[in-house]
Amino acid sequence: GGIRSTIAKGNLTVGDVFTLYPFDNVLSVITMKGSELKKFFDTVAAYGGMPVNAGVRLVISNKKVKSLTINGKAINDSQTYTIATLNYLVNTEDYFKNHLTRMDYSIYVWDYYTAYFRHLAKNNNGQITASKDGRITVE
């Protein structure tokens, strides 16, 4: 993943967002077959985990995928899945090379982060909190 720092407790600035994510990547939305998506999660497991969507539940054992579901369902090899990721990863990583379709958006990822943090703060009395939700379990 591209996240390069943690966020300390206290006021969050735009500069903090750039420190958190200092790259000029944009969002790519791609479609790919389940068989190819599994290859991506094999890489996630080999690294011991990385940020994934809230609907994903991944159990890693000995740096291998032990179990994997998306929205409570196993990945179907022949089904087409739509995922959002970084244009950098689509351009450089083998596990994304066999995507079926691709749409790049012209907004930088750090702008998405900034907008998301503002949204969270606006809807939570100025507070942003985080918690573990069990997306990835390493045994």
Where are these regions (language model features)?
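Catalytic centers of hydrolytic enzymes
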Residues: G1-E139
